[in-house]
């Protein structure tokens, strides 16, 4: 027997036994008593001879959601810039930049520099001081609510904004520092790095006044790592099992496997393999029947569970295994300890 329940991500959802629910924060307001708590944040910056300002109202539920998300994706900080759920609030800020550009007849270069000036205006705050962690990369919503951050936080925010505005962007990691690159035409002046056939010009979000292609002196000759902007689902799994119907020869074992997408973007064609391994019968052997449970696509922030019932021989060494795999994420393998019934 196989059972599947996935809790789908969405703005809001039904609740109750057997109904899909969501990890994603809801900003629905069914009544005034349920009105969300909002963070109101005002920002002021200047580009060339013009002073600009913007105001954002960000639900506390969204901030809390991102605070609870994993902050250990140190292999590619670009993932923090690509979450599906903060696009609505970034769009409000992006709308301000677009209106500003239209009002001043800004070129595309001006638009980039205006975003850069906005991010450079934010206070630099070390992670250790503000969070207690040596490294705490912030999601864009966190940086906007906190009103600043360190180099990777403001680089992530700038990359998220420019990416949504249609600019090709990458993150640029140098020793002890994070910046970003913006895709420009080949005749643009300044320092650039080639990546996948394109030139990405250096932007520093913590050094006020530096423009496109201007690298701080201490990083001029540093080796760099380019971090592409691509969503990367990251799946998590754990399981428990319950022994049922112990007979003289076999026992039935119900395995309950929890799955969740803690990365960015949608995990495609997820499947869980559930088996009772039989190490005494040889490497890779499993008691029949094992089970393949198809989940399908799992959205960012979605979580749920699958179940399968296995037949386990009595008095034989057994180990339960669950393997979660799919098209665009790294497989996750979890096993129990050895046991016999």
Model regions: which residues?
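Secretory targeting signatures
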Residues: 1-33, 180, 257, 267
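Secondary-structure boundary elements
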Residues: 75-146
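Hydrophobic/aromatic-rich core segments of domains that either
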Residues: 153-232
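Low-complexity, acidic Ser/Thr/Pro/Gly-rich terminal tails and inter-domain linkers that flank the onset
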Residues: 226-250, 341
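Short beta-strand elements of extracellular/lumenal beta-sandwich folds
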Residues: 249-266
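Short acidic, flexible loop segments centered on an aromatic residue
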Residues: 266-282
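Short proline/glycine- and polar residue-rich coil/turn motifs
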Residues: 294-304
């Amino acid at each position: 027997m196989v059972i599947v329940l996935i809790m789908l991500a969405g703005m809001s959802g039904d609740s109750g036994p057997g109904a899909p629910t969501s990890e994603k924060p809801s900003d629905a307001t069914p009544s005034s008593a349920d009105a969300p708590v909002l963070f109101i944040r005002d920002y002021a910056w200047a580009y060339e001879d013009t002073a600009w300002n913007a105001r954002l109202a960000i639900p506390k539920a969204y901030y809390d959601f991102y605070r609870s998300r994993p902050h250990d994706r140190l292999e590619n900080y670009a993932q923090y810039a690509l979450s599906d759920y903060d696009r609505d609030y970034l769009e409000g800020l992006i709308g301000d930049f677009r209106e500003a550009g239209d009002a001043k007849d800004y070129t595309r270069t001006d638009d980039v520099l205006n975003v850069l000036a906005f991010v450079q205006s934010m206070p630099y705050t070390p992670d250790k001081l503000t969070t207690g962690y040596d490294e705490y990369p912030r999601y864009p919503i966190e940086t906007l609510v906190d009103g600043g951050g360190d180099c990777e936080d403001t680089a992530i925010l700038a990359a998220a904004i420019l990416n949504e505005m249609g600019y090709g962007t990458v993150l640029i990691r140098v020793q002890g520092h994070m910046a970003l690159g913006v895709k420009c035409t080949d005749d643009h002046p300044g320092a650039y790095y080639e990546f996948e056939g394109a030139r990405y010009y250096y932007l520093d979000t913590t050094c006020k006044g530096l423009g496109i292609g201007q690298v701080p002196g201490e990083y001029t000759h540093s080796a760099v790592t380019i971090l592409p902007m691509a969503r990367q689902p990251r799946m998590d799994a754990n399981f428990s099992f319950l022994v049922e119907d112990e007979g003289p020869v076999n026992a039935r074992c119900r395995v309950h496997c929890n799955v969740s997408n803690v990365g960015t973007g949608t995990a495609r064609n997820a499947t869980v393999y559930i088996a009772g391994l039989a190490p005494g019968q040889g490497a890779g052997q499993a008691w029949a029947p094992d089970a393949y449970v198809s989940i399908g696509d799992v959205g960012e922030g979605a979580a749920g569970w699958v179940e399968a019932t296995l037949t386990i021989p009595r008095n034989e060494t057994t180990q339960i295994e669950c393997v979660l795999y799919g098209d665009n994420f790294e497989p996750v393998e979890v096993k129990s300890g050895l046991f016999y019934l």
